[in-house]
UniProtKB/Swiss-Prot annotation:
The gene is rpmF. GO terms for biological process: translation. Transmembrane segments: none annotated. InterPro entries: Ribosomal_bL32 (IPR002677), Ribosomal_zn-bd (IPR011332). This is Large ribosomal subunit protein bL32. It comes from Corynebacterium efficiens (strain DSM 44549 / YS-314 / AJ 12310 / JCM 11189 / NBRC 100395). It comes from the Bacteria. Keywords: Ribonucleoprotein, Ribosomal protein.
Length: 57
C-alpha cells in the first residue's frame, strides 16, 4: 500500500477528491420478450435468464 511521505493539507485533500467524477454507464439494446430495453452490459445475461426485472429500466 502506498504511504505518503508527508501530510497532505485538508484543502489539498478535498480539492483532489472533488476532481473525481463517475462515468455514465454504457447501455446496450437488448430484446427481451419481444420488447427492446436499454440496460447495462453487466445485467444482460441476468435479464435474459429472467433474474432481473427489466421493467425498472
Amino acid at each position: 500500500m502506498a504511504v505518503p511521505k508527508r501530510r497532505m493539507s485538508r484543502a489539498n485533500t478535498r480539492m483532489r477528491r472533488s476532481q473525481w467524477k463517475a462515468d455514465n454507464v454504457a447501455l446496450q439494446d437488448v430484446k427481451i420478450d419481444g420488447q427492446t430495453v436499454r440496460i447495462p452490459r453487466r445485467l444482460v445475461k441476468a435479464a435474459q435468464l429472467g433474474l432481473v426485472d427489466v421493467e425498472q429500466f
